[in-house]
């Protein structure tokens, strides 16, 4: 893709997200979401092959359906309230349709089927954008409409997403699919706490984006896409191996790493709201994610797969300029637990 075209596409995608973040008008929110959707499709098709085209088509059909449901809900709300403001979402039908549309855009269960397939069919850099930046706009709409969302609709979606995110990643060998199922589980945690403390959802989103970005950067550096290629990382770049180990355990939520913070705070927040069964189910289900990340860690660091790679080990990075962000991102992704007391301002 030529640099001027790529620049225009990226600016359109960023502009769409900014429009959604700064708007309280339903029509402009819908326009921003459409800009976001249309801009990423050429990025998903950057590598011209049948898998990328199939992934782009699946993404387009799913997101177009979600946009249609969202516009229908907005129109019904306009018919009843006569206003476009997001704060005037009073109709239960509108609330249900908006929640369903946002769940489709985020990949929440039972609308999650497109996330692993689309992520697997794209390049690692495109998958990074899909699993991080593309979550910001729908979650911001969810943040704005959280007072009017029906808990009986959103909470079952959130719990099911955590279950699917754990079960789906158990038998996977493709790293992009594993990260996609991990994304589904993280979206479930975020949407569960949105109803009770939307600000905590923003904290969870920030930590999730940082951890996922760092993981994708390391995978792109090694051109790692499968568990087999991940198991040979020690042979190509020994310095990368412990970083990947720490990041995967952090994504799984193992204390005392950074990924444990949002899970801990979300369970605490739900318990404060006199909910016992739901956070218990969420905590137990989170062990599924931790299990398949620990299995990856075991295959990467504690076993030696048969390898024909005779190249010399890389004890330093080839291009330091490309990896300049890796050190701060790795520190934030693994060592945020000591600052947890400062996060009491979210209560």
UniProtKB/Swiss-Prot annotation:
The enzyme's E.C. designation: 7.1.1.2
Membrane topology type, per the record? Multi-pass membrane protein
Tell me if Transport is a UniProt keyword of this record: yes
Q: What Gene Ontology molecular-function terms does this entry list? A: NADH dehydrogenase (ubiquinone) activity
Provide a GO CC annotation, any one: mitochondrial inner membrane
Membrane-spanning parts? 3-23, 25-45, 60-80, 96-116, 149-169, 178-198, 200-220, 237-257, 274-294, 323-343
- Where found? Mitochondrion inner membrane
What the entry lists under InterPro entries is as follows: Complex_I_Subunit_2, NADH_DH_su2_C, NADH_UbQ_OxRdtase_chain2, ND/Mrp_TM
UniProt main location, coarse? mitochondrion
Keyword Electron transport attached:
yes
Instruction: Output one GO BP term.
Output: mitochondrial electron transport, NADH to ubiquinone
Superkingdom of origin: Eukaryota
Q: Which reaction equations make up its catalytic activity?
A: a ubiquinone + NADH + 5 H(+)(in) = a ubiquinol + NAD(+) + 4 H(+)(out)
How far does the signal peptide extend, from start to end residue? Answer: none
Which keywords accompany this UniProt record? Electron transport, Membrane, Mitochondrion, Mitochondrion inner membrane, NAD, Respiratory chain, Translocase, Transmembrane, Transmembrane helix, Transport, Ubiquinone
What role does this protein play?
Answer: Core subunit of the mitochondrial membrane respiratory chain NADH dehydrogenase (Complex I) which catalyzes electron transfer from NADH through the respiratory chain, using ubiquinone as an electron acceptor. Essential for the catalytic activity and assembly of complex I.
Family indicated by similarity:
Belongs to the complex I subunit 2 family.
- Assembly notes: Core subunit of respiratory chain NADH dehydrogenase (Complex I) which is composed of 45 different subunits. Interacts with TMEM242.
PANTHER family, per the entry: NADH-UBIQUINONE OXIDOREDUCTASE CHAIN 2
- What is this protein called in UniProt? NADH-ubiquinone oxidoreductase chain 2
Species per Swiss-Prot/TrEMBL record? Mungos mungo
Name the gene behind this protein.
MT-ND2
């Amino acid at each position: 893709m030529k640099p001027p075209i790529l620049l225009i596409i990226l600016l359109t995608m960023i502009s769409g997200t900014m429009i959604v973040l700064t708007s309280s008008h339903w029509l402009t929110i819908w326009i921003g979401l459409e800009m976001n959707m249309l801009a990423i499709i050429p990025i998903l098709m950057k590598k011209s092959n049948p898998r990328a085209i199939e992934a782009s088509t699946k993404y387009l059909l799913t997101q177009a359906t979600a946009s249609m449901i969202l516009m229908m809900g907005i129109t019904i709300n306009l018919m009843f309230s006569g206003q476009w403001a997001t704060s005037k979402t009073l109709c239960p039908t509108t609330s249900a349709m908006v929640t369903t549309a946002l769940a489709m855009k985020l990949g929440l269960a039972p609308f999650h089927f497109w996330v692993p397939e689309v992520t697997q069919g794209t390049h690692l850099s495109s998958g990074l954008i899909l699993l991080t930046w593309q979550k910001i706009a729908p979650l911001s709409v969810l943040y704005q409409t959280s007072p009017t969302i029906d808990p009986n609709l959103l909470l079952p979606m959130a719990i099911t997403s955590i279950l699917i995110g754990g079960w789906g990643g158990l038998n996977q060998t493709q790293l992009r699919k594993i990260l996609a199922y991990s994304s589904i589980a993280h979206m479930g945690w975020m949407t569960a706490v949105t109803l009770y403390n939307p600000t905590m959802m923003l904290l969870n989103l920030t930590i999730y984006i940082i951890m996922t970005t760092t993981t994708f950067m390391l995978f792109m550096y090694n051109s790692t896409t499968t568990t087999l290629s991940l198991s040979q990382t020690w042979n190509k770049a020994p310095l990368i191996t412990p970083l990947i180990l720490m990041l995967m355990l952090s994504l799984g939520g193992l204390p005392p790493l950074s990924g444990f913070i949002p899970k801990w705070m979300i369970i605490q927040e739900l318990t404060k709201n006199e909910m016992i069964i739901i956070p218990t189910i969420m905590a137990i289900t989170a062990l599924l994610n931790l299990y398949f990340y620990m299995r990856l860690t075991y295959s990467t660091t504690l076993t030696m797969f048969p390898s024909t790679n005779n190249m010399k080990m890389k004890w330093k990075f080839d291009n330091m300029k490309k990896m300049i962000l890796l050190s701060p991102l790795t520190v934030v992704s693994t060592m945020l637990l000591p600052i947890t007391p400062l996060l009491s301002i979210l209560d």
